[in-house]
Amino acid sequence: VSFINNVSGEDEIKEFFDIKTTPKRREFIKNKWKNNNGFFKPFEDVFNDISIVKIFSDQATKHGEPGSYINYMKKKILRGIQRTDSHLNPFLQHIFLGYYQSEFVFPYLNSKNNQVLELIEGDIFNINNISYYNIVSLSNIFDWSDIDYVKENVEYLSQLKKGSAVILRQLNNHKDWHNIFNKYFIEQKSFDLYWKIHDRSLFYDHFKLFIRK
């Protein structure tokens, strides 16, 4: 809503993401947005510390500099918009349109297979048989965590079998967890380099892959 009120209108946003729009026209819209004096306002409205804490609590900003999320998210989203195929990015579509343009954007949305998932409410310590799993994805939970909690997680994950993988992401957080994981895991740094280039979700600085020794 803030972007519509301060920068652009709904019709123009739809035109930007329409696959029938010419590259020249899309570039014009893109430059119009970037040069708009109100371009900064939506990020101030949405990503200020007060709004973030109100929604996620103060734990969400634990490792970020105070007030840094406004510029951080502006930079990330602007970089995404500047990509040649930005109109095809489902994450940008969801941000600006509120929906995906295609039902085929993610394979799991239209999978014909019967996917039965076991849902466990709680943290990783609520999973009694953690060694059963080959891949553990922690999302960006460590952005919310102090060092002691990270250490507790790593100790628990040490139960994983050799060759198992732990994946985590970092948003506005440059903490290096290597020294904590190093006791039991080997970091695959090429994973981070690859996803910094190819990730479509735009928001993250780091993508860490640790393999159980």
Residue spans of the language-model regions?
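Conserved beta-strand signature within the Rossmann-like core of class I S-adenosyl-L-methionine
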Residues: 162-175
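Adenosine-cofactor binding site in Rossmann-like domains, unifying the SAM/SAH pocket
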Residues: 108-127
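Active-site-adjacent loop/helix micro-motif of nuclease/hydrolase catalytic cores
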Residues: 129-130, 145-150
